[in-house]
Amino acid sequence: MLEDLKKDAATRMVKCVQNFQADLKKLRTGRAHPSLIEHLKVDYYGSEVPLQQVASIAVEEGRTLVISPWEKASVQAIEKAIFKSDLGLTPMTAGTVIRIPMPPLTEERRREISKVLRHDAENARVAVRNVRRDVMNDIKEMLKEKLVSQDDERRAEAEVQKLTDKHIADIEALLAAKEKEVMQV
């Protein structure tokens, strides 16, 4: 029983870290990267689909994203989706190819992004701690019902705390790396 709880906690904590990583990929850092726009929803024959399903996205010269739609008819819809996004990007269309030059980040924008990063990191830490709290409550409940001994309860709580510390450290490392990338001129 305790092993199942610990495995469940580990799985849920890993998911929290993965969600934080996914959030980090969506933040613009001045470098061109396909993950910045691949999640944008494009109106494709009446249904909303991710950009990556209607076009290929490549990086050109490190600072330009190149979008090659698979159908010429979807060029306008892709442009519209990019304009509607809050990324502050300006697409330039040449025939069927859309180029998006990445403007350099201002110091003010870097600080804003850094604040957003810290906020997202705190949300991820809270999510990990919530998993820990749920598991600790389950362990205490098992102790009350005499399903586990007090020694097993303490051991399990210590292991869950170690898991929590490890995943929070992972979040901190991801945050530090992304902040360094954002603040780099």
Task: Please annotate each region the language model reported.
Residues 22, 80-88, 119-123, 133:
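Short, intrinsically disordered, mixed-charge
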Residues 1-76:
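A positional/architectural concept
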